[in-house]
Regions:
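N-terminal intrinsically disordered/low-complexity leader segments
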Residues: 1-8, 194-213
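Helix-turn-helix
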Residues: 14, 18-56, 60
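Amphipathic alpha-helical segments that line or abut small-molecule/effector binding pockets
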Residues: 17, 85-100, 155, 178, ...
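Hydrophobic alpha-helical connector segments
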Residues: 60, 74-107
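Short, basic, alpha-helical segments at the C-terminal edge of helix-turn-helix-like DNA-binding modules
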Residues: 63-69
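Amphipathic alpha-helical segments used for helix-helix packing
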Residues: 87-91, 101-129
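Hydrophobic/aromatic-rich alpha-helical bundle segments in the mid-to-C-terminal region
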Residues: 122-130, 142-199, 213
C-alpha cells in the first residue's frame, strides 16, 4: 500500500525536529544518527533516504529557524511575526527573553551551535550565514535610528542578540545571566530606536500559520 501524499515530507520534518532538539541539548559531535532517528520514532537504516550525511541534516536544522517561518515547530520559544512592521523589537524581546534562555531544546540553533559550526563542514557555515543575515534583514526593516548605516545597525543588533544569549547561557549564576540578558535587550532596543516595554511584558510573539493565509 503506497504512503499518503506528503508522507516523505512529514518524516523528514520529524527527523530534523529530533536532530534540532538533540543538537541543541548535546552539540553536533555528541549526537549519533541512531539517536536522531530513534528520537523521530524511526530506524537508523532509513536516514539516507532523506539526507546524504549528518552534515546535510545539520544544515537543514540551522536553516529551518529563520528561512521557513511557517514551520512553527522550529520557532518554539522564540516566535515572531515576520510580516509585522514592528518585527525588529519583537525579535529583540523574544530572542533575549527568559523563555528563550530556559528552553534549551527548542532554542535558536545559532545560540546552541556556533562553536560547532565554526568547526563544521562549509555547508553548515553557509547556512549559518544565511540564517544570520535573515535575522539582520528582519531587524533592519524596522530600524528607526539614523546614527549609522542601517546594515551596520542590523548586524550589530543580531550579534548582540545571539552573542548575548550565548554568554548568558554559559553563566552559572542565573541572576547574572538575567542581568546580562536585560542589559543586552536594553542596549539593543536603544540602538534600534525602539521604546522598551515595561519589565515582564516580553514573551511569546505569534508566528502566522499557513492556514491563516
Amino acid at each position: 500500500m503506497p504512503y499518503p501524499l506528503g508522507h516523505q515530507r512529514e518524516v523528514k520534518k520529524k527527523i530534523i525536529e529530533s536532530a534540532r532538539r538533540l543538537f541543541n541539548r548535546h552539540g553536533f559531535d555528541n549526537v549519533s544518527l541512531q539517536q536522531i532517528m530513534a528520537g523521530a520514532g524511526l530506524t537508523h537504516g532509513g536516514f539516507y533516504s532523506y539526507f546524504r550525511s549528518k552534515a546535510d541534516l545539520y544544515a537543514d536544522v540551522l536553516g529551518c529557524f529563520f528561512t521557513d517561518p511557517n514551520w512553527k515547530s522550529c520557532w518554539d520559544g522564540v516566535e515572531v511575526d515576520l510580516t509585522s512592521t514592528d518585527v525588529g523589537p519583537q525579535v529583540v524581546r523574544a530572542y533575549l527573553s527568559r523563555q528563550h534562555y530556559d528552553d534549551v531544546e527548542n532554542s535558536c540553533p545559532m545560540v546552541a551551535l556556533p562553536s560547532d559550526v565554526a568547526r563544521s563542514h562549509k555547508a553548515a557555515k553557509h547556512v549559518f550565514q544565511t540564517v544570520f543575515l535573515a535575522m539582520v534583514s528582519a531587524l533592519e526593516r524596522s530600524l528607526h535610528a539614523k546614527k549609522r548605516p542601517r546594515h551596520d545597525s542590523g548586524q550589530a543588533l543580531a550579534a548582540l542578540c545571539v552573542g548575548g544569549m550565548v554568554v548568558a547561557r554559559a553563566m552559572v549564576d542565573t541572576a547574572l545571566a538575567d542581568e546580562l540578558r536585560d542589559a543586552c535587550m536594553r542596549v539593543a532596543l536603544d540602538l534600534g530606536g525602539w521604546k522598551r516595554r515595561r519589565k515582564g511584558r516580553s514573551g511569546k510573539l505569534r508566528v502566522p500559520s499557513r492556514s491563516a493565509k
